[in-house]
Amino acid sequence: MKCFFINLDRVPERRTHMEREFRKVGLEAERFAAVDALRIEDYENVRYVPHAGARWEIVKSQIGVFESHRRIWQAMLAQDLDMAAIFEDDMFFLPEIVDLLSRLETAAPQFDVVKLDSAFYPVPLSAPELTIGRWPLRRILSDSTSCGAYVITRQAAEQLLAWSDPYCDHIDDFTFSPRPGWRAYQAEPVVASQLTLLPRDFADRYVNARQTVVQSERNIDPRLRQKVAKAPFPRRVRKEVNRTMRKILWRVHGRRRLLSSGGILSASRMAPESLYGEDERDLSPDGLGELVDPAERS
């Protein structure tokens, strides 16, 4: 399966890190130059339009990330690929990723996208709908943070390109949010993670790479963290009413219906034996905080 990783030209440290990760597990990958959020105006065919989606506005860094993923989807079509694995440049891989990618390559067209990583907070997932080797695939039933590692089919890339013309949303919410007929799955246990989400005692082995991630310009450059305009008051009221109703429905019916159908509320962790051998310690990343129902998230 063709693998891409997204990397800004001016952050070679992350490129070095990702090349090391791919070598570690024996995979080859093509570097894809990320869209530079500081030069968005220099790019042609940027499809971001304020208010044209789930959000009212998004910041430049989010536009750059979204455009980078869109352009990889376009590259898939240009290269006539039936499927591809797409990664951001702050990832850690388990060796099992090789087996999972190989098995997924033979499983199409049973899915549109398969999420390989996790942000390690609870997300409602369906009962297993497919089993790929040791990995049950559960349909993602809510927003799911992180677009750091996923497999996508050609047909799904075409569909996402159409849906995102125009767009105003975060790339992870846009890619994995439930839609009628959209087959977005979570593979469990996960085989990849952003470095900042790894268990502290394990991630300390990657201290230099972690520092590179922590120093991401998205977090520290004020030019990329400009304030966005608030939606008009009536829209904000409607959004809050809808959010409150979803909370009520989740508490009254949602959780029970999910569990009775074989679904789970899962944080999609890495298998302890994959990280630590037989030493099964708590893999909750530092600072995760109290686990909350998905309806509690704004």
Give a label for each model feature.
Residues 1-87, 91-298:
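An acidic/histidine-cluster motif and surrounding catalytic segment
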